[in-house]
């Protein structure tokens, strides 16, 4: 896969941190998330995520912003995402990576996302979590 540095990529892995920032107008990263999402959509970038990220984002929205925010996400935004449903194999690869982690802060959902992104050979991740850089992704924004 060739590098797309300098322009939005064709496919990008999407993380909970980006989705939450996009949907929460009071989040410190909201403006950056909105601008990045607009650029990605303007270039018809495929927004790829896992079913675990969908569940994590819905739970986070519900706990912080209420059920209506989670409902809006699930009904209005998720249909525009390319959701990879986590199967037993992807879960096992993510779990193995998570168990190998020695530090706090890296979640099972993160490790499943890393595994999914590597499996699909995605170079870019729409995220505010810098651990994606450590995993070899070019982060957006």
Identify the meaning behind each predicted range:
Residues 83-124:
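Active-site neighborhoods of divalent-metal-dependent phosphate/nucleic-acid chemistry enzymes
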Residues 1-9, 54, 114, 119-141:
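Acidic, PIN/NYN-like endoribonuclease modules and their adjacent C-terminal/linker elements
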């Amino acid at each position: 896969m060739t590098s797309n540095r300098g322009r939005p990529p064709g496919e990008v892995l999407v993380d909970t941190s980006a989705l939450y920032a996009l949907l929460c107008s009071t989040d410190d990263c909201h403006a950056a998330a909105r601008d990045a999402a607009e650029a990605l959509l303007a270039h018809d970038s495929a927004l790829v995520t896992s079913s675990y990220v969908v569940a994590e984002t819905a739970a986070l929205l519900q706990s912080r912003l209420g059920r209506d925010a989670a409902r809006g996400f699930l009904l209005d935004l998720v249909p525009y995402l390319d959701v990879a449903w986590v199967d037993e194999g992807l879960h096992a690869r993510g779990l193995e990576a998570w168990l190998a982690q020695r530090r706090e802060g890296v979640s099972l959902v993160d490790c499943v996302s890393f595994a999914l992104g590597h499996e699909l050979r995605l170079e870019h991740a729409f995220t505010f979590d810098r651990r994606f850089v450590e995993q070899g992704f070019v982060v957006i924004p």
